[in-house]
C-alpha cells in the first residue's frame, strides 16, 4: 500500500548545481479548514422547556442571522440577474524558512519583539541586502506545485511608498521579472466551487513573485503604535491569478485550494487562520447585454471598473467581501453612478466594504530595479530535483484514498486530507500500516479496502468524536496508532462487539494504560457468543412484550423499528455477548419470516 506522507525534503543532495546549505524543512502538513455550522432548526427554543437566558439569546441571534442570510441571498439573486462578476486574487503567503529574505537574522513568530533584527531590516545607512538562497526552496516548491514555468533569470525591484512599517521607504519585490509565470490551478465541485461553474474550472496564475514582509504594528490606544521589526524581510510570495473567476464561492474555493497546496508542499508557515496567508481581491461587474467595458488588467479586456479589497484573512471573508462589493457596484451603476478606482477594506461581520484610499497605480509606486541586488539565476538541476521530491498534493491524496488501495468514499477522504494540519491523515496511515502488519496473511484490494474503511471510521468518527466531546485538539499520542489498530483487529476478528470496542476506546482515551489484550481479559469484555437458541429466546421475549410494534413492522413496513429490537437485545443481554448483526438477522427472521 503506498505511503501518502513525505517527512523531509532532501533536494539539496540531488542537485547538479553548486550545493546550497539549506536548513532541514519540517514535515509536510496539510491545513485545518475553518468549519461553519448553521442552525436551520426554526424551533430550537421550545416554550415548555426551561432554557437559560444566555442560551435563549444566543439561539435567537442565530435564527435572526439565518433569516437575514436567507433574505439577503434572495435579494442577491435578484440583484445579480443580468450582471457578470469578475474576480482576480492576489495571495500573500509567508514562506517556511528559517532565514529572512535579505538579511542573516532568523525568522520567528514567537520571539520577543525586535530581537530578530539585522541592520538592513531597520534600513541603517550603509546596510546592504544579502539574498539568502535557502528562502528560494519553499518558493520554488510552491511554484512547481501550482504548475508554473520557472524563470531561469529573475530580478528584484523597489516598490516605493512611505509608511511606518517599512523603514526603508520601499519594499523589495519582483514586479517586472518574477521567478515564476504562467501557472494554473484546477478547482473541482468537491472543492466547493459554485454550481454554475460545473464539475471543474481552471484558474490561470499570471505570476508568483518573491517579496519582503513589513514590520508588525501593535496599536496601543489612544494614539500610540508599537512596531515589531522581527517580521521585516520575512520572505513572502505573492500569487497573482488572472481575472477569470465569476462567483464568490469559487473565489473562496480558489484561495482555500491554493492554501492547501502550499501547506502540502511545506512552502508556508501557517494558513489564514494564524495570519500566515492573506488575500486581496479585485472585483468588477458589467452588464451581460452591454458592450464590453473599458476596464482592463493583466491583458483581459472588456471588464468593468475594478476595485481592490485588501487584507482578507479567512475564506469566509473572501466570499462575503466579494458579495458585498459586487452588490455595492451594481447599486452604484443602476443608480447612474460610476465605480471609482479605489482600495477598499472589509471587516468581519460587515455587510458593506469601506473606502480606504484611491488606488495607487504603477506610477505612484515608482517601481525601479534594485541596484543593490544581482539577478536571481535558478539552475535547471535545482528545479528538476524539487520536482522529483515534491510530495503528493491534495488532489493526488484524494485519488489514492478513494482508489483501490483504501476504497474510501469522498466524504471520508476529504476530512482525512484536510483536518488537523495533516496530522489526522498521517495517523490514519499509521493505523492502516499497523492493521496490515497484524493481518499480514490477508492481501489484495478487497482486504485493503476493508482495513482502510474500518480505520477511517474509527479515526474520523469514533476517535474524532472523543476529541470533540472532550473539547481538546487532535493529538496522535492520546491513543497510539498501534493500540487503535489492535482494537480494530479484535473487532474485525469478532472477538469483541462494536459497543465494547467503543467502551475500550473511551477507557484508553481517558488514560487507561493497559494493553488491549490485558484490558479485555481483566474487564471480562471478550465476546462469548450466544447460541442461536439464546438469540431466539431473547428476541421472542421482546416480540411478545411489544405486539403493537411488531404489527407496525409487518403491516406498515416500518422496518426502522427493527433497530429498536436489536438495541433492546444488546441492552438486556449479557454484556459483550450480543452481536448487533446477528441479533438483526434473528429479529427479521422471527418478525418477517421469509421476507
UniProtKB/Swiss-Prot annotation:
GO terms for molecular function: ATP binding; glutaminyl-tRNA synthase (glutamine-hydrolyzing) activity. Belongs to the GatB/GatE family. GatB subfamily. Residues 1-72 form a transit peptide. Allows the formation of correctly charged Gln-tRNA(Gln) through the transamidation of misacylated Glu-tRNA(Gln) in the mitochondria. The reaction takes place in the presence of glutamine and ATP through an activated gamma-phospho-Glu-tRNA(Gln). It is found in: Mitochondrion. GO terms for biological process: glutaminyl-tRNAGln biosynthesis via transamidation; mitochondrial translation. Pfam families: GatB_N (PF02934), GatB_Yqey (PF02637). GO terms for cellular component: glutamyl-tRNA(Gln) amidotransferase complex; mitochondrion. The keyword Ligase applies. This is Glutamyl-tRNA(Gln) amidotransferase subunit B, mitochondrial. It catalyses: L-glutamyl-tRNA(Gln) + L-glutamine + ATP + H2O = L-glutaminyl-tRNA(Gln) + L-glutamate + ADP + phosphate + H(+). It comes from Talaromyces marneffei (strain ATCC 18224 / CBS 334.59 / QM 7333) (Penicillium marneffei). The lineage of its organism: Eukaryota, Fungi, Dikarya, Ascomycota, Pezizomycotina. Keywords: ATP-binding, Ligase, Mitochondrion, Nucleotide-binding, Protein biosynthesis, Transit peptide. Its EC number is 6.3.5.-. Subunit of the heterotrimeric GatCAB amidotransferase (AdT) complex, composed of A, B and C subunits.
Amino acid at each position: 500500500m503506498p505511503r501518502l506522507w513525505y517527512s523531509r525534503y532532501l533536494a539539496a543532495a540531488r542537485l547538479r548545481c553548486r550545493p546550497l546549505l539549506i536548513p532541514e524543512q519540517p514535515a509536510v502538513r496539510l491545513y485545518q479548514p475553518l468549519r461553519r455550522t448553521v442552525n436551520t432548526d426554526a424551533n430550537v427554543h421550545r416554550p415548555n422547556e426551561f432554557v437559560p437566558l444566555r442560551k435563549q439569546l444566543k439561539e435567537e441571534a442565530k435564527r435572526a442571522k439565518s433569516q437575514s442570510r436567507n433574505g439577503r441571498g434572495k435579494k442577491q439573486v435578484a440583484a445579480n440577474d443580468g450582471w457578470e462578476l469578475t474576480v482576480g486574487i492576489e495571495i500573500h503567503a509567508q514562506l517556511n524558512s528559517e532565514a529572512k529574505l535579505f538579511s542573516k537574522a532568523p525568522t520567528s513568530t514567537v520571539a520577543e519583539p525586535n530581537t530578530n533584527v539585522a541592520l538592513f531590516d531597520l534600513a541603517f545607512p550603509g546596510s546592504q541586502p544579502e539574498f539568502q538562497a535557502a528562502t528560494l526552496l519553499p518558493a520554488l516548491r510552491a511554484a512547481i506545485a501550482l504548475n508554473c514555468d520557472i524563470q531561469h533569470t529573475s530580478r528584484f525591484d523597489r516598490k516605493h511608498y512611505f509608511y511606518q512599517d517599512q523603514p526603508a521607504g520601499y519594499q523589495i519585490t519582483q514586479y517586472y521579472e518574477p521567478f515564476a509565470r504562467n501557472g494554473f490551478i484546477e478547482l473541482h465541485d468537491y472543492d466547493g466551487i459554485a454550481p454554475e461553474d460545473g464539475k471543474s474550472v481552471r484558474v490561470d496564475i499570471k505570476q508568483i513573485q518573491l517579496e519582503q514582509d513589513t514590520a508588525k504594528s501593535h496599536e496601543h490606544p489612544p494614539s500610540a503604535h508599537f512596531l515589531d521589526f522581527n517580521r521585516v524581510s520575512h520572505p513572502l510570495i505573492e500569487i497573482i491569478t488572472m481575472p477569470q473567476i465569476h462567483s464568490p464561492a469559487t473565489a473562496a474555493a480558489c484561495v482555500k485550494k491554493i492554501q492547501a497546496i502550499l501547506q502540502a508542499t511545506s512552502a508556508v508557515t501557517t494558513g489564514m487562520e494564524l495570519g500566515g496567508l492573506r488575500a486581496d481581491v479585485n472585483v468588477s461587474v458589467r452588464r451581460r447585454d452591454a458592450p464590453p467595458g473599458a476596464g482592463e488588467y493583466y491583458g483581459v479586456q472588456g471588464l468593468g471598473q475594478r476595485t481592490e479589497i485588501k487584507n482578507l484573512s479567512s475564506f469566509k471573508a473572501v466570499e462575503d467581501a466579494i458579495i458585498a462589493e459586487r452588490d455595492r457596484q451594481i447599486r452604484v451603476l443602476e443608480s447612474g453612478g460610476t465605480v471609482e478606482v479605489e482600495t477598499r477594506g472589509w471587516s468581519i461581520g460587515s455587510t458593506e466594504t469601506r473606502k480606504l484610499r484611491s488606488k495607487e497605480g504603477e506610477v505612484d509606486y515608482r517601481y525601479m530595479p534594485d541596484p543593490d541586488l544581482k539577478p536571481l539565476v535558478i539552475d535547471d538541476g535545482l528545479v528538476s530535483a524539487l520536482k522529483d521530491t515534491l510530495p503528493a498534493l491534495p488532489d493526488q491524496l484524494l485519488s489514492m484514498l478513494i482508489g483501490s488501495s483504501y476504497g474510501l468514499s469522498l466524504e471520508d477522504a476529504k476530512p482525512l486530507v484536510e483536518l488537523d494540519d495533516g496530522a489526522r491523515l498521517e495517523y490514519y496511515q499509521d493505523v492502516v500500516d499497523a492493521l496490515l502488519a497484524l493481518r499480514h496473511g490477508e492481501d489484495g484490494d478487497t482486504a485493503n479496502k476493508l482495513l482502510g474503511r474500518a480505520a477511517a471510521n474509527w479515526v474520523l468518527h469514533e476517535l474524532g468524536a472523543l476529541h470533540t466531546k472532550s473539547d481538546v485538539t487532535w493529538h496522535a499520542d492520546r491513543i497510539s496508532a498501534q493500540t487503535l489498530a489492535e482494537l480494530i483487529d479484535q473487532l474485525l476478528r469478532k472477538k469483541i462487539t462494536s459497543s465494547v470496542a467503543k467502551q475500550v476506546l473511551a477507557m484508553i482515551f481517558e488514560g487507561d494504560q493497559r494493553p488491549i489484550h490485558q484490558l479485555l481479559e481483566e474487564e471480562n469484555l471478550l465476546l462469548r457468543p450466544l447460541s442461536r437458541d439464546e438469540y431466539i429466546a431473547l428476541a421472542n421475549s421482546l416480540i411478545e412484550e411489544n405486539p403493537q410494534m411488531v404489527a407496525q413492522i409487518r403491516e406498515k413496513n416500518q422496518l426502522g423499528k427493527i433497530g429498536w429490537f436489536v438495541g433492546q437485545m444488546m441492552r438486556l443481554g449479557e454484556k459483550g455477548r450480543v452481536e448487533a448483526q446477528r441479533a438483526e438477522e434473528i429479529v427479521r427472521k422471527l418478525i418477517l419470516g421469509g421476507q
